[in-house]
Regions:
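The feature captures the beta-strand-to-loop junction immediately N-terminal to the Walker
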Residues: 37-39
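Catalytic Walker B motif of ABC-type/P-loop ATPase nucleotide-binding domains
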Residues: 160-163
Length: 276
């Protein structure tokens, strides 16, 4: 499988002199849904901001679909990497939902017909097509986050980065977000999710990158990383609750690497059937 993102010996120091990333090496395959996890200050967002050239390496190299991100402007990288910020207020400025979502395609030089088509498709994906004339700040926090995502999807990037996309979402919003991630994977997009919610990561992501103090300390399948509490503890991260339960019940034959409630339910049902 081809690489969507390649990070080689990446080190970054902020102008203050604080070192935020330390010799990070990482390959992300095309079409994967990958979570960046770790406690606050671990370097997750700093790393992700190198993907679209919001930050330039102090040393090392980041390539996205073969493009050296440090040699392109953020506006040039917008065709390749869409970045959805954690706080929608940092991203929204249009007076209507349609104006907000149409800005990106229009800025990329698309004509009026193509711009409208891209905007409507993106709004349909996130469930906001009925709100095209609504002012963004008349919407709920969760809807505004979905609007930011639509604004990014309208530019049809190859890679989508989402910073805490599940924060502020109700049950319906979380279900919709899961459906969107599945759809992005189905059409070949690479998605990078920054999250502190391990239950969400377990359900929606297939690979996990664990960071601590600017270093990458583990990269592997979601099951492999989330079912290893000692490794997660290095960055003050706890496994999903159901995984902690599975580990506690492992002496009774429950697999310790269960990471979702659905897996636990299936395991217990099968165990009950066998004991009858």
């Amino acid at each position: 499988m081809s690489l969507a993102i390649s990070v080689e010996n990446l080190t970054y120091r902020y102008p203050s002199g604080r070192q935020a990333l330390r010799n990070v090496n990482l390959d992300i395959e095309s079409g994967n849904t990958v979570a960046l996890i770790g406690k606050n200050g671990a370097g997750k967002t700093t790393l992700a901001k190198h993907f679209n050239s919001l930050l330039k390496p102090t040393s090392g190299r980041v390539t996205v679909t073969g493009i050296d991100a440090s040699k392109r402007s953020t506006s040039q990288m917008a065709r390749v990497v869409g970045y959805v910020f954690q706080n929608p207020e940092d991203q929204l400025f249009g007076s209507t939902v349609m104006e907000e979502v149409a800005f990106g395609p229009k800025n990329l030089g698309m004509n009026q017909e193509e711009t409208r088509s891209k905007a409507e498709r993106a709004l349909s994906i996130v469930g906001l097509l009925p709100y095209v004339l609504e002012h963004p700040y008349n919407m709920t926090y969760g809807q505004r986050k979905m609007l930011c995502l639509a604004s990014v999807l309208a530019m049809d990037p190859t890679v989508v980065v989402m910073d805490e996309p599940n924060a502020g979402q109700d049950y319906h919003g979380l279900r919709l977000l899961g459906s969107i991630l599945e759809q992005l994977k189905r059409i070949g997009k690479t998605t990078v999710v920054i999250s502190h919610d391990m239950e969400f990561v377990a359900r929606e992501c297939e690979k996990v990158v664990l960071m601590h103090d600017g270093k990458l300390i583990a990269h592997g399948s979601t099951r492999q990383i989330l079912s290893d509490p000692s490794r997660l503890a290095l960055s003050s991260v706890r496994p999903p609750q159901v995984t902690r339960l599975a580990i506690g019940l492992s002496s009774r034959g429950v697999p310790p690497d269960i990471i979702t409630v659905e897996e636990m339910a299936h395991t217990l049902i099968e165990s009950t059937r066998k004991s009858v």
